[in-house]
Amino acid sequence: MTDISPREIVSELDRFIVGQADAKRAVSIALRNRWRRQQLTGPLREEVLPKNILMIGPTGVGKTEIARRLAKLANAPFLKIEATKFTEVGYVGRDVEQIVRDIVEVAINQTRERKRKDVQARAQLAAEERVLDALVGANASAATRDSFRKRLRSGELNDKEIEIETQTSGGGPMFEIPGMPGAQVGAISIGDIFGKMGGRTKTRRLTVSDSYEILINEESDKLLDSDQLTQEAIAAVENNGIVFLDEIDKICVRDGRSGGDVSREGVQRDLLPLIEGTTVSTKHGAVKTDHILFIASGAFHIAKPSDLLPELQGRLPIRVELDALTRDDLRRILTEPEASLIKQYVALMDTEGVVLDFTDDAVDALADIAVAVNSTVENIGARRLQTVMERVLDDISFTAPDRNGETVRIDAGYVQKNIGDLAKNADLSRFIL
């Protein structure tokens, strides 16, 4: 679990996300509280429960982006999922306990990657021996093997093709056991049943350099204790897991609607025990959800947070409102973040040998058009900038391979020429922008 301070988390998020200081503070405090709880001892540690968060704000203001960036910072099992994917237990569809099964799989992969690094040196030696076996045969003399080992380490043989035996992945078709739907153990892979028994292999023809990664992973997995790995992954989920539940406003039952809706109120009821704390059975073992942090988010355009079940509202005690984006925010989004849209397009065109030069008045014009279209058609926040940029740079993107070595100056006049009329015509922009 990461031990960086809330201030450092906020400054890291500031590199990629413009504004929304309240939301950044809330998630940074929640993340730090995970670490604080780990420092406690005795029964008090079990009593400290995470304070789940509800983010409320219009679409395209940074709710999902905060979650994405938080996942990279957290160094903990993280799952982002849409609430609309689920149906009430007993109906065809995914039940909410699948959230826990999915985050356990994420944690197992994370833990395996971390542990592979610990045994990488031994795995590399074992992989090297297998490559040498493929090159000179298992019965070659020590002198021959040493000679080839030197050439192998110098990179001389990287492009040489060899045949290696590799383990087949434990995939295969998935099915559910009748009478035991996803609520019990989830879909079972045939590989889970038969894969461990025979240890099936297949012969593959690869270059030496391509074979290394596959063989190192295989040899690493042989050195790992799979039971211990699973236990560590489950412990990581139970203590540090973070679930980002997007589109929670879409499962609200709005006033005046009647009739059954299996993916709305029923899903809310099923979420209650999961967020409050329950034990979920997975194929890897039982997982307790008491200390998993849930961050829910929704635009709440039509529904209101008060349309959620009162019990669910009580389980999301921290409310954070994200502000709608202003013209100044949109202007900053175009230029300030490390991976801003303008930097992305400049880098993309640079691969074709075309230099894009954006002037300040072009940035102003792009922001003005995005604001104008958002106000007349539908406010989709910063996502509108992508549509506007694509439209402005459409001609350059198409002709770039023929313009190698050119420098294209993008100013306000260029922007207006390519998109100005569309932005003014509300009917056209409704369909094109």
UniProtKB/Swiss-Prot annotation:
Database matches in InterPro entries: AAA+_ATPase, ATP-dep_Clp_protease_ClpX, ATPase_AAA_core, Clp_ATPase_C, HslU, P-loop_NTPase
UniProt family annotation: Belongs to the ClpX chaperone family. HslU subfamily.
Keyword Nucleus appears in the UniProt entry: no
Organism: Nitrobacter winogradskyi (strain ATCC 25391 / DSM 10237 / CIP 104748 / NCIMB 11846 / Nb-255)
GO annotations of cellular component type: HslUV protease complex
The protein's name in its UniProt record: ATP-dependent protease ATPase subunit HslU
One GO process term, biological-process aspect: proteolysis involved in protein catabolic process
Role according to the record: ATPase subunit of a proteasome-like degradation complex; this subunit has chaperone activity. The binding of ATP and its subsequent hydrolysis by HslU are essential for unfolding of protein substrates subsequently hydrolyzed by HslV. HslU recognizes the N-terminal part of its protein substrates and unfolds these before they are guided to HslV for hydrolysis.
Gene: hslU
Top-level taxon in the UniProt lineage: Bacteria
